[in-house]
Amino acid sequence: MAKRFYSAEEAAVILQEDSNSSSEFEEELSESDIDWLPESESESDLTDSDSESAGPSTAQQSRSEGQARDISDTDTASEGGSPVPTSSNANPRGQRAARSRQSMPARAAQRPPLPYELCHPQWLPSNMETPNLPPFTARRGLQVDTTNMQPIDFLNIFLPENFLQYVCEQTNIYANQRIAKKPTSVLAAHWTPVTTQDLKMFLGLIFNMARCPKPEQQMYWTKNPIHCIPIYSAKISRCRFQMLLTCLHFSNNDDDVGTDNPAHNRLFKLRPFIDHLNKVFAEAYVPEQKIAIDESLIPYHGRLAIKQYIPSKRSRYGIKLYKLCESGSGYTFKLKIYEGKDSLIEPPGRPPYMGTTERIVLDLLNPLLHQGYHLYVDNFYTSVPLFKHLFSVQTPACGTVRANRKGLPAEVVHKKLKRGETFSQRSNELLALKFKDKQDVLALTTIHSEETRMVRTRTQEIVKPLAIMQYNKFMGAVDLSDQFLSPYRLDRKRKIWYKKVALYFFQLCLQNAFII
């Protein structure tokens, strides 16, 4: 029989007929496409066209995954990201995406060029001079009174009663909106308004699911004595649990301006939750002097405008988060979801020539500037303009750097070294150094001198720069945070992207509560 090829319209009709034949329960209580964020918003680009790189090939480089490992033993290439390719000519959604992108502000074209003194700083031979570091003045540590507090009270710091009440209100509003559209649905017949006690019980069961993973969600309510976990059926019915998960909401859909409006916020569904977390994380605890900025990837394989593809990550597709964490404990102080290269990031006091990655760093660091913090970043963020600006606001930094960044000394970049050798040059407070172990490592620092230390490996003793040793020690904060969460991750597939991110946020609150 010859193969039959369907047009897009015919395929849509067939798929719609198949969808209508599904069971009523699965249709009504599934995570419907009402909250699907269409790919037509725009195609995000993680590779950061605003980065201060010398050539266009920078956007194609991949970032190294092992920040917590010794950088002298790993690839110094930085991790990039790329959107899932789509064809705007063959797909109407792609055509709408092109129109949407045309309405976005062309900030890259408006950005002024990098000043000459930052593109061509004067580099001189280093002379073991340590920069005049600013004093550390932050009032670090816990900012709340924990006397006589029970373990649950630490979680209540990040999930207080007023926030849970807000989530209940938005969840009930969304449930009523769905019921109004389908008054004869299963949801309309069985829905009762959710209370804060219901929400707490729901979150407790969600947390326990991460501790006791099962292949399918309905298995938590099975009556099979081999697989049965009695607390689930004793506390809530499976239908009620699915209703709560389906209607879980954090903002009112009626307040969304729509994707065609230039003022549309891609993170509208989660914006109240993100703002709340950044507020309570900063109020509850002030980190120690050593901090790090890196990114996490929340696995997600659905259709989403801000979904990223990062080959070096274990879960290559997902939603990217930038996190500022304390190096010693992994406490998450501030987070930011990547929204695309056309998102508006305007941290106060930022120089006009700063690119996207620099703006992200300044936005995360804004509450901690002028206090003497020591920042550690990898080569995705490190640049001469950023480090010089951070030093001017009393925040020295250290990080590996890509060889094609503007302003680096050519003599350091192209220097041929033998294993164990170090070469460096200095431009005022900024030190550029190259170290050869198994491979070349380029680094910039405004914290250290070119001081070296003897390090013993399994087979020999080698001399390493102190800057490299401390980078290896303090850079793994975000990896440490992810390591804490990895045994408790809820990796179950979900259609609705913001619900998967929201469950990650709830678990992040649990982790921070454990740390403090």
PLM features: residue spans?
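N-terminal initiation segments
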Residues: 2-388, 394-405, 448, 490, ...
